[in-house]
Amino acid sequence: YNVVKKGIPWPLGDFENKRSFTSIDNLCYVVEGLLTKDVASGIYHMGDDEALSTNELIALMCEAMGKEPHIWKMNRKMMEGCAGLGTLLHLPLNTERLRKLTENYVVSNEKIKLALGIDRMPVRAADGIMKTIRSF
């Protein structure tokens, strides 16, 4: 959030990843459904229907703040090399941090939707992100 707010360019635009998010509205909808419907106990993953890339997230955050996104598509191999050097020199951008920033983390919400008898969550991921950023 602060990187985008300060207008700092995102240099990892060459990496395409997908991440699951959960809007507060969808979370409240699911909690209400669990309280009011006869849902079997179990482990359910919670998430919006659409996974977003970090590049999409930054673009949405910028849109919500009325800013232009600054997404730089620095060469992937060069960034991996810089991160490797960062690991050796104990710098903030290292191999582990680069992996965490660029890896996929997508969960399926199919089980909870099936349990609640719905086809889609009420709020799209992009709309949830926009609402959240505008609330700050």
What residue spans do the PLM features occupy?
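Substrate-positioning beta->alpha
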Residues: 12-35, 41-42, 127
